[in-house]
């Protein structure tokens, strides 16, 4: 938790959040995610929450699924988390990991188009296995008020240049949005 407390500029409803780990909008999901990491090291849950790959222990949620049993193991881990936290958690694992697995599965096609991109996918997956980060997907431009035409939106809803200087450009707005609570 300390690692996400430092060096963050997080704003909620226009106000800077002083400590993301204590803010009522972020604390519940941060605490649950910390619990999931703790479960991976707890002797009671370790065999359910982790898997051995090439001699290394990895989070089962990040591990590439190759067999039906791999999928059942992921399901058991998810069920265990739900039982342990006593509720429904919308993000028990990385919601983007499935896309990474799909790209990994499609490497033969990707190699024909861009071998470096294909290699980057493999490198990224193995880095995720080793370091066990928690991705947050932010993969689309903000939608804004969908009842308004694009030209009628808040001008700062989308990323745009507001000033050019000899040193570069100044931008304002958002490039990506996420529905994640963290």
Predicted features along the sequence, with ranges:
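Intrinsically disordered or highly flexible coil/loop and linker segments, enriched in small
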Residues: 6-10, 39-43, 130-134, 141
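Short secondary-structure junction/hinge motifs that connect adjacent elements
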Residues: 15-22, 43-55
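Glycine-rich flavin
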Residues: 48-182
């Amino acid at each position: 938790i300390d690692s996400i407390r430092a060096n963050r500029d997080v704003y909620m409803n226009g106000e800077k959040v002083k400590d993301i780990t204590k803010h009522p909008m972020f604390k519940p999901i941060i605490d649950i995610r910390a619990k999931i990491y703790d479960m991976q090291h707890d002797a009671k849950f370790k065999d359910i929450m982790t898997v051995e790959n090439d001699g290394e222990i990895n989070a089962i949620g990040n591990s590439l699924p190759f067999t039906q049993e791999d999928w059942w193991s992921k399901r058991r881990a998810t069920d265990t988390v739900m039982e342990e936290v006593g509720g429904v958690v919308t993000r028990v694992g990385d919601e983007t990991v499935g896309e990474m697995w799909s790209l990994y599965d499609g490497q033969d096609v990707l190699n024909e188009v861009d071998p470096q991109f294909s290699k980057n996918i493999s490198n990224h997956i193995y880095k995720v296995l080793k370091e066990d980060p928690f991705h947050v997907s932010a993969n689309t431009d903000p939608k804004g008020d969908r009842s308004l035409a694009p030209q009628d939106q808040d001008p700062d809803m989308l990323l745009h240049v507001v000033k050019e200087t000899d040193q570069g450009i100044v931008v304002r707005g958002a490039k990506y949005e996420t529905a994640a609570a963290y």
